[in-house]
Regions:
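N-terminal glycine/serine-rich phosphate-binding loop of ATP-dependent small-molecule kinases
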Residues: 1-93, 103, 146, 217, ...
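Active-site core segments that coordinate phosphate-bearing ligands/cofactors
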Residues: 8-9, 109-123, 128-166, 177-192, ...
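Short, acidic/turn-prone active-site loops that include or flank metal/cofactor-
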Residues: 34-40, 94-102, 173, 255-257, ...
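Short beta-strand-loop/turn "lid" adjacent to the catalytic site in phosphate-handling enzymes
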Residues: 61-97, 121-127, 154, 158-180, ...
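Short loop/turn motifs at secondary-structure junctions
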Residues: 68, 195-198, 373
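Hinge/lid segment of periplasmic solute-binding proteins
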Residues: 99-113
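A conserved helix-loop-beta module that forms one wall/lid of the active-site cleft
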Residues: 192-207
Length: 454
């Protein structure tokens, strides 16, 4: 009988947290559990790490009892760091959507490295980890001085399970201001402003370490099973495609819609349009453009149920109903825009859903043009389940759009790092592009309006 190899993946997004159990033999999903995340008040808005730990332990314990678990892989959202002293936190883990005090913001802007060094744009709130750390260092000097390790979020959870502290490039390269992607080393912010001794030795996202006996007691797992160092979630989506020979673009969706292109010359890197270089699991810079698509959709369709029909989309095109960028200000390819509707107002739920679908497709097309358009577009995450969106995107770009058939590209990529295995990703056939009268003119008008909003 073949040896069992069940991999549990802790997939911690900004909005939701999941633990997925995958069969390492064929990467099929065995089980999964999901829960919403919460942000707590206090010194500043911070993540509920205690609740996240309980959720992780409960899921792992349940999976061990029902199916057996042979290894744990970790992937989380970026722009988050934990300050660790001993086996606890020196300070709560700051929520990156917290709007930093203006005085801190202005002071940090004079200290951060230039874009051509970090390929990291200045982003609002705490989306640059460097800004978070500067805030904590200057506002809470006593607590900050106790810090032994600064850990990016995947590595914090690996630390909780293995007791070992590491730095890792995919999370450091996620618009932190802390990393030089082209050089593969820390930026001058580390050492000049932030003590270098607080950043532990580098490890690869695929490096594995044994589960401690303490963590084994908490999770019900066997001590010593392998746990990965952890990877930034968008980069986990790239892992199955890293050895693909064809130029392609990955659209990873969730709270953020993130476009990354492999083997494609990018457009000019424009810090003013939320472009950056992510770092893939092999340590290579990856041109990236993104916007807060999941958050946009949530705000635009609040109270709506279902999905848009093609007839509803055709009606929106015919009536000239437009959603402008900037519902979430300060991010995306139009960071100065302030959102709103243009043209005729939507009538009812159906037109809201249809307008939102067109908006997401047009914003994704814009990001693809910035990051570099591949010969194929692969959809991962919630947008992969939105057929009208996929068909509109194919029509707008003129490029074949495929929906990933994997249960979750993020979880699959994280599992592959532990398995040290290649994988032929499962794709369905290319979607059929929509053929809607007026779509091209509608898109042209939307782009003109969006440029005016810049």
């Amino acid at each position: 009988m073949d040896k069992r190899n069940h991999i549990a993946i802790f997939d911690l997004g900004k909005t939701n947290q999941k633990v997925v159990l995958i069969d390492g033999k064929d990467l099929t999903k065995i089980d999964s559990r999901k829960a919403p995340n919460s942000v707590l008040k206090g010194l500043y808005p911070h993540l509920d790490t205690a609740s996240q730990w309980r959720f992780l332990c409960d899921c792992l314990s349940g999976f061990e009892q029902q199916h057996g678990v042979d290894g744990v892989a970790i992937t989380t959202h970026g722009a988050t760091a934990a300050l660790v002293v001993g086996d606890t936190l020196a300070l709560p883990v700051l929520d990156y959507e917290f709007e930093l005090p203006r005085s801190v913001d202005e002071a940090y802007n004079t200290l951060r490295p230039p874009f051509d060094e970090t390929l990291s744009p200045r982003l609002p709130g705490g989306l640059n980890i460097g800004a978070q750390l500067y805030f904590l260092q200057t506002r809470f000097p006593k607590e900050f001085s106790r810090t032994e390790h600064i850990l990016t979020y995947p590595q914090y959870w690996s630390f909780r399970l293995t007791g070992l502290a590491h730095s890792e490039a995919t999370s450091l390269g996620c618009h932190t201001d802390l990393w030089q992607p082209e050089m593969g080393r820390f930026s001058n912010l580390v050492g000049r402003i932030l003590p270098e001794k607080l950043f532990p030795p580098l490890a690869k996202a695929s490096d594995v370490f044994p589960l401690t006996s303490t963590a084994a007691q908490a999770t019900g797992l066997r001590a010593g099973i392998p746990v990965t160092c952890g990877i930034h979630d968008s980069n986990a989506s790239l892992v199955p495609w890293l050895k693909s020979g064809d130029p392609l673009s990955i659209v990873s969706s969730g709270t953020w819609t993130i476009v990354m292109s492999l083997g494609v010359p990018p457009g000019e890197m424009d810090a003013g349009r939320d472009m950056l270089a992510n770092v893939d699991a092999l340590g290579r810079p990856t041109p990236t453009a993104r916007f807060m698509g999941g958050r946009d959709h949530e705000l635009l369709t609040k109270g709506c149920v279902g999905s848009a029909s093609l007839s509803d989309i055709a009606a929106v095109i015919s009536k000239g109903i437009f959603i402008m960028p900037g519902r979430v200000p300060g991010v995306g390819p139009f960071p100065q825009a302030r959102g709103g509707w243009r043209g005729a107002p939507p009538v009812g739920m159906a037109e809201k859903l249809a307008s939102a679908t067109l908006y997401l497709a047009l914003m994704t097309q814009t990001c693809l043009a910035l990051a570099g358009m591949g010969q194929r577009i692969i959809l991962e995450g919630p947008l992969a389940r939105n057929e009208p969106f996929a068909r509109c995107l194919s029509a707008l770009t003129g490029v074949a759009v495929h929906v990933s058939a994997d249960a979750t590209g993020t979880a699959t990529g994280a599992a592959l790092l532990l398995l040290k295995a290649d994988h032929d990703p499962r794709l369905g056939p290319a979607v059929q592009p929509v053929d809607l009268p007026g779509l091209s003119a509608y898109a042209q008008n939307w782009r003109a309006y969006a440029q005016q909003a810049r």
